[in-house]
Amino acid sequence: MTETSMRAGNIDVYGFLEPQSIQRSGQSQFESENYIKNWMQNSKRDVYLGAYLNGAHWQMVVILPKENVVIWFCSLHNKPDNYLKGIINRSVLFFNIFALALVSALKGLDDTQQSKSKTPARWIVVKCNRQKGSTECGYYVMHWMSTIILENFKNNWEMYFIDARPLEPERLKALRIQWAKYYLKVKNET
């Protein structure tokens, strides 16, 4: 996805969360939160996209920390689990409190406005494509990610994602071919 973002000319807009760093297995909540907080602070992107593996099902989260908004995508139309909501809410809260404190310190202001930054992130569950089968969830996540990047989406999520119909078989086939080619390219480079 980083290459797609580079080709689209918006690499400075989109950041990507490493799936293994936000999963429930193998990471503590503290480690996952630290990873997200550090990545948002250091990379300074507007939008962060993350593939999240919940059990055996891939889902997607889009974080807009400056807007205090999180967008949720699930091809089974499940709600986000409490683990993910917790680590993201705390990470976004920290990001906003830190950013406001930094601005206040630089401007010599008091931090009375910090109470505004303490509101939890607003979660938007979009009406996204619903998968028919049981194994194509990862392709749905890749479809949504590439759509967001190539169309340069940063707001009005409910206007863009309004179609609950499954992806067309031709689109799924194209995604499979695209990612198989990419995998082979990376494999041959190593």
Please report, for each region that a protein language model flagged, where it lies by residue.
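Predominantly extracellular/luminal regions of secreted and cell-surface proteins
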Residues: 1-5
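Cysteine protease-like catalytic core of ubiquitin/ubiquitin-like
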Residues: 7-190
